[in-house]
């Protein structure tokens, strides 16, 4: 593997978790294992193709584990790997920053956020 060159280390971070969907996927996986269909339901605006691509990239980077159960019909779940769990603090801070940003721009965080487990957690903390 050829070594890459980065100007600053955050470039390496964004190479792994950057983009529109990866942090959202990771946030959902902080709440436990999820099947692809569960993730799709939690993120209705992502296409199936994009979800599959993002999951493959996160798995290739060692951030998530793909668990294949030997059964019929086939069952596959995704979970944060031990390495991926090291991102939980960062993901929590990103969620908190986003809530503050929404509140600053719109005045009320919860009038803008959709109903979800992640947002219920945020409501309990405020």
UniProtKB/Swiss-Prot annotation:
Keywords carried by this UniProt record: DNA-binding, Transcription, Transcription regulation
SUPFAM superfamilies: Winged helix' DNA-binding domain
Pfam families assigned: HxlR (PF01638)
Gene Ontology terms, MF aspect: DNA binding
Presence of keyword Hydrolase: no
InterPro entries per the UniProt record, alphabetical: HTH_HxlR, WH-like_DNA-bd_sf, WH_DNA-bd_sf
Domain HTH hxlR-type per the UniProt entry, residue ranges: 8-106
Coiled coil segments of this chain: none
UniProt protein name: Uncharacterized HTH-type transcriptional regulator YtcD
Gene (name only): ytcD
């Amino acid at each position: 593997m050829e070594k890459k060159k980065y100007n600053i280390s955050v470039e390496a971070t964004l190479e792994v978790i950057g983009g529109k969907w990866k942090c959202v996927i990771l946030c959902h996986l902080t709440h436990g294992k999820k099947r692809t269909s569960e993730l799709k339901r939690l993120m209705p605006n992502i296409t199936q193709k994009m979800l599959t691509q993002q999951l493959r990239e996160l798995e290739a980077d060692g951030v998530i584990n793909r668990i294949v159960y030997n059964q019929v019909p086939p069952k596959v779940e995704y979970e944060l790997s031990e390495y991926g769990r090291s991102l939980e603090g960062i993901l929590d801070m990103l969620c908190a920053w986003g809530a503050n940003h929404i509140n600053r721009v719109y005045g009320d965080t919860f009038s803008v956020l959709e109903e979800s487990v992640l947002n219920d957690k945020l409501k309990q903390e405020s």
